[in-house]
């Protein structure tokens, strides 16, 4: 008789025995996502993360997560002019069950961009890297379209190359002026009503009439060293960094406790 291995016995179990299925959500916790105080609605939503287990800490798994939220949801407004603007928020600190976020970028929805592009006009784009007073380096993208004059009988409204260059230069000048003299909080407050784009449209009217001028995208290229106190100021909670360094000891340097004679 040939001697061989019994595959059924080598596996050490009966055929057809299924492993116990454990629901992965039983090992997770819900955390509330908080937006900075620049927005009227602070409670953005909730996010899941695995509980702290061994060396894997739950708060470390949350830091760095990016949440994309519509401006209409952040401002609790049903205005259609706000719904196409998306803000990105990055988790920087976990306070209890709250995830405190900071501004991480802005973008327009694809359908809004496609709707703005039309025939018989000139599309003008500009982008520039600027630094805020509190150390954030932002790349700001601006877009605009030429508009037909009310007295013109032409079907088209194309701008000349010299006019396009002049408009692009004016866009960069206004963006640099408004961002370099402001902190990140003030820049976000300008992006919410899109006041920078309105200034550009007024300033460029003498060169060529424009329409649908807007800040298309904002990227955060570089951010300063993380400070909990500054993040708490963004969230309207002053003194958040208190107690981070601990209480100062009143004992002098080189202090040695006295030797006890009896225990």
Curated annotation (Swiss-Prot):
One example GO MF annotation: structural constituent of ribosome
One biological process term in Gene Ontology: translation
PROSITE patterns recorded: RIBOSOMAL_S3AE
Subcellular location: Cytoplasm
Segments of this protein annotated with the region Disordered: 235-263
Keywords from the UniProt entry: Cytoplasm, Ribonucleoprotein, Ribosomal protein
Main location (coarse class): cytoplasm
Pfam families membership: Ribosomal_S3Ae
Entry's Gene Ontology cellular component terms: cytosolic small ribosomal subunit
Ranges of biased composition (kind: Basic and acidic residues): 244-254
HAMAP family found in the cross-reference section: Ribosomal_eS1_euk
Family that this chain belongs to: Belongs to the eukaryotic ribosomal protein eS1 family.
Subunit structure: Component of the small ribosomal subunit. Mature ribosomes consist of a small (40S) and a large (60S) subunit. The 40S subunit contains about 33 different proteins and 1 molecule of RNA (18S). The 60S subunit contains about 49 different proteins and 3 molecules of RNA (28S, 5.8S and 5S).
Name the UniProt record assigns to this protein: Small ribosomal subunit protein eS1
Protein's organism: Bombyx mori (Silk moth)
Native organism taxonomy: Eukaryota, Metazoa, Ecdysozoa, Arthropoda, Hexapoda
């Amino acid at each position: 008789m040939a001697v061989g291995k019994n595959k059924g016995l080598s596996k050490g179990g009966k055929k057809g025995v299924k492993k116990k299925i454990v629901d992965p959500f039983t090992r997770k916790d819900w955390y509330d996502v908080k937006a900075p105080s620049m927005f009227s609605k602070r409670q953005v939503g909730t996010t899941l993360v695995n509980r702290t287990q061994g060396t894997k800490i739950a708060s470390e798994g949350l830091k760095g997560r990016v949440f994309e939220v519509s401006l209409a949801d952040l401002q609790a407004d049903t205005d259609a002019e706000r719904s196409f603007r998306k803000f990105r928020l990055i988790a920087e600190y976990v306070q209890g069950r709250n995830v405190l976020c900071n501004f991480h970028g802005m973008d327009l929805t694809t359908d809004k961009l496609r709707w703005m592009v039309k025939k018989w006009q000139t599309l003008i784009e500009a982008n520039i890297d600027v630094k805020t007073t509190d150390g954030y380096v932002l790349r700001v993208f601006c877009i605009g379209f030429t508009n037909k004059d009310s007295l013109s009988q032409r079907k088209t409204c194309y701008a000349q190359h010299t006019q396009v260059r002049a408009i692009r230069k004016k866009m960069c000048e206004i963006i640099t002026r408004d961002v370099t003299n402001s902190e990140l909080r003030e820049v976000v407050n300008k992006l919410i009503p899109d006041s920078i784009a309105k200034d550009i449209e007024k300033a460029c009217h003498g060169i060529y009439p424009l329409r649908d001028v807007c800040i298309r995208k904002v990227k955060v290229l570089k951010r300063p060293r993380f400070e909990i106190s500054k993040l708490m100021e963004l969230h309207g909670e002053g003194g958040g960094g208190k107690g981070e360094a601990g209480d100062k000891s009143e004992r002098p340097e080189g202090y040695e406790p006295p030797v006890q004679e009896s225990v």
